Amino acid sequence: MTDSLFPRLVLAKGREKSLLRRHPWIFSGGVARMEGKARSGETIDIVDHQGKWLARGAYSPSSQIRARVWTFDRNEAIDSAFFERRLQQAQTWRAWLAERDGLDSYRLIAGESDGLPGVTIDRFGNFFVLQLLSAGAEYQRAAIISALQNLFPDCAIYDRSDVAVRKKEGLELAQGPVVGELPPALLPITEHGMKLLVDIQGGHKTGYYLDQRDSRLATRRYVADKRVLNCFSYTGGFAVSALMGGCRQVTSVDTSQEALDVARQNVEINGLDLSKAEFVRDDVFKLLRKYRDQGEKFDVIVMDPPKFVENKSQLMGACRGYKDINMLAIQLLNPGGVLLTFSCSGLMTTDLFQKIIADAAIDAGRDVQFIEQFRQAADHPVIATYPEGLYLKGFACRVM
């Protein structure tokens, strides 16, 4: 019936259009049937309703994303050499970026945008932090680790696949050392002249938000001799950058005392004036209302909240959350002040986020000018056929 060496996923009639445009996902609603038995994560061929070969990918029976494409080349085998090629292609770009910007830390693999769906690898010095977020990525774990070791023979690898999305793939959470020594409790890295401490084992995501690197640098352009409020500060990257930019004072707000303690250390290890830095453990929504009621004012506010939306059913509620928190920030800014506001929610489009900021300004009774736009750093590329890869967006807004 077929010359395929792999089980075949047959698409429903008319559902091949996205694959012909080289989008890497096949949703469960587009599947007509499976031909042959495939285990979770196993390599399969994907064909149209007439049996025409379209792609080769990984099967995920537990997920709404029923398959993720590894390759659109029928002659390409999915083996250790495949993963080594993908890693080498990605490293070529990151090595150039690292030399250009003086980086020792970057995202080596950004999932679908680097041709490895469900795979995230962040590099912090000689430590590589691995996240395998799909059934296919987990199935190929040994091949991925082998490829990484071949490319970086002396590296240490730590697994941070402790992400809830794995449960949607029918996978258990995983965390721990894979290769080499255990990372220190706080690993020092460098970024645009800053020294920063990263908690690989217990920090958010892989330990640090590398995607905001360029936005942190851009902050310095707005803060000279200004009073700055840094909301959802985590370990203080924006605060350190603001101090390096010559701010008069910066207040960092987060609910985690552990993160604030690291933020304080980050200020100290950079030799910056600790008297200009304040660290407040509080809920940002509540604190902004308190500041508003007390008549507090700031010249620059950084608003970098966590993801508010995980799926489409949460989008409307997330819009209200973004609008509320940005309205409060706008109310706290002096005339001519600048709001640096971000969304890392992939379902939140740039246009929708901009509209939310505009609506927040109307509710605050203020006019705003959009003066600069931000996105994730260049080591987090967005492949043209997978626009969902652009998840981080932000604006610098001048508040009148």
From Swiss-Prot:
Any GO MF annotation of the entry: rRNA (cytosine) methyltransferase activity
Coiled coil feature spans: none
Pfam families noted in UniProt: Methyltrans_SAM, PUA_3
Keyword Transferase: yes
InterPro entries documented for this protein: PUA, PUA-like_sf, PUA_sf, RLMI, RlmI-like_PUA, SAM-dep_methyl-trfase, SAM-dependent_MTases_sf
Domain PUA: 6-84
EC code: 2.1.1.191
Record's catalysed reaction(s): cytidine(1962) in 23S rRNA + S-adenosyl-L-methionine = 5-methylcytidine(1962) in 23S rRNA + S-adenosyl-L-homocysteine + H(+)
Source organism, top-level taxon: Bacteria
PROSITE patterns on file: PUA
The keyword rRNA processing is assigned to this record: yes
Intracellular or extracellular location(s): Cytoplasm
CDD domains: AdoMet_MTases, PUA_RlmI, RlmI_M_like
GO cellular component annotations of the record: cytoplasm
Entry keywords, A to Z: Cytoplasm, Methyltransferase, RNA-binding, rRNA processing, S-adenosyl-L-methionine, Transferase
Listed HAMAP family: 23SrRNA_methyltr_I
Family: Belongs to the methyltransferase superfamily. RlmI family.
Function of the molecule: Specifically methylates the cytosine at position 1962 (m5C1962) of 23S rRNA.
Protein name: Ribosomal RNA large subunit methyltransferase I
Source organism per UniProt: Klebsiella pneumoniae subsp. pneumoniae (strain ATCC 700721 / MGH 78578)
